[in-house]
Amino acid sequence: MRKTILLFLVLLYNVSMVASPALRIKILVSQPDGTKVTLVKGGDEHISYYITSDNYVVIKNASGAYCYVWQDTVSGFTTGKFLAHDVNDRSRDERVWLERYGVRAAEITVEAKRLRGRQGVSSRSLGRDQFGSPLIPVILVQYSDIKFTVDNVTATYQDYFNAENYTGNGGRGSVRDYFVSQSMGKYTPTFDIVGVITLSNNRSYYGQNDGFYNDVHLDEMVSEAVEKAESSGLDFSKYSNGDGRIPVVSIVYAGVGEQSSDEENAVWAKFSSRTIITKGGTISSYLVTNELFYNSSESVYELDGIGVFCHEFSHFLGLPDFYNTNESTDIFGLSFWSIMDYGQYWANGKIPVGYTAYEREFMGWLSIDTLETKKQLCHVNALGSESQNAYYILNDNDDTRSEYYILENRQPSTWFPKTLGSGLLIMHVDYSYGAWADNEVNNDAAHQRMTIIPADGKLVKENQAMPSDYQGDLFPGITENTSMSDYTTPAFAPYRGGSLGKYITSISESNGVVSFCYMADGILEKPENLSIQNKDGSRVLMWNPVEEAETYCVEVYDGETLVKTQDVSYNFMDLTTVGLVKHPTFKVIAKAARYVDSPAAEISFENPLGVENITGGNGGEEYDVYTIEGVLLCKDKAWDELEDLPNDKIYILRSKKSNTVKKIVNGQYE
């Protein structure tokens, strides 16, 4: 078998490996000395460990006891001499040793980075079939000792991956449903379920860790699965894009994944760009995910949700991780707000969180509008809706246009949980090719490159957060925070230039739509109580003054035709200039330099001096033609000659024979 597997050469062309973050489960461990210690799962696809409540790294020693990690100058990271204990149970010697030798999670950054190397994920979507309807192979594999436990495994996974409106396992959609929804129908993959394939060795052979280094025989596991699938008759060429390249093969393995369990010999779910050669073509990448998830609240193993697969498949499509890949616990990243962070685990992974606006544009599934430096009223429709939209606010101090803020609208829907609240989500992005390529987007606590600006000013990690903490992230949300500037709390805090020099105000939410004023102190109120009154022998249009208004724009319409526009400084206008419009409509708009214009207030009335629109002409008559203000333009025009008059005008016609007064609107006879 070993010789056979070697035929499926694993080529290391720009090899990268990216994975799901550890599900930060707490376990209560009994130690050999009779004590118990509470630990939290940590690590990634390369390194697996546990963390104490005060962030010291712990792994198992050869006898199965949990010990603190220290860094030996010869062996590197290894187990120390002390068993791990909760803070209050530590001896004096143990505390002294920890202060000198103990390794905190943030301190393994160098080792984790060395193992990751350059990840190869892209600064933009990789062009890996983000459009169209590709056929994706999914090979079901089990070990010699760990078999699939779900009933009707092939049929179950056929529905899990492909069923429309899938509700199995407590979900709200299949894997295909998820990507069809995020792409708004632009990407509609079909997953070809293959297997079950039984591997030659037991699970621990493929998934065992070397110290705290993960899955020492994973490549062999994938190559063996591919070889056995091909030997059983699978033609990989049907998955090719036409040039002999098979973009990806997916593996679902029996049992749990190490990232979401305490099974240290289980395989950690991950995506890799390692290349595998088959008779049917060259496989460019693979991803592996697990069958089962341990539901601790009900103490049962159940079919894992689609979240982990959707996360890993999103790596295949080009997205990096937005969690801290070095496992520092003081970095928020995007937490539950993104599937590329902890959002893959929402509802135990059964209902993963939908794509952010950034992720949708990254794929080419959404175009985000850029707000220029002019005041305006903006409306943001919900992500996932037919009319979804989002906005950029650029940092003009950055000539590369790499730093910006994204404003998107989160509303409860299939892929956006009600528990997280609703409103405007503001993200701060500082793109760096190196950070994206190395999969280190949010590894620097002082310079997170993809995170949110919370309305309540508090970023609370998922293992400590209450629902109100997430609801408090949104504007106006439960905090009723309606503005954001360089001087508010929270404030725009760009990394370049010190200040942004832009601001938004009057953030509101109504019927699922978020509105705000950009580069304005607010929106002026609509003028009220419009009326036509007699004043000093003249007809006057009047209205209540609007607070903060500096001028008013009055538009006069004849039907749908704009007759004239007049700016006034007071809350009234003389109507003698209306002329001969019979049924004028007035629209009044309040204006001010630092505010968005008010909505238009409207009133209509019948002008006793006006004339009716012409309804037809007498071919034997001639007309004198006047402007609406009464200026004579020409005399003795026959009816058919009136067609030569310029459009977009209103003319008064006086008949030579009947001396009647009529008019033409926009050069068209009504």
Model-inferred region functions:
Residues 4-13:
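Sec-dependent N-terminal signal peptides
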Residues 593-608:
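Extracellular fibronectin type III
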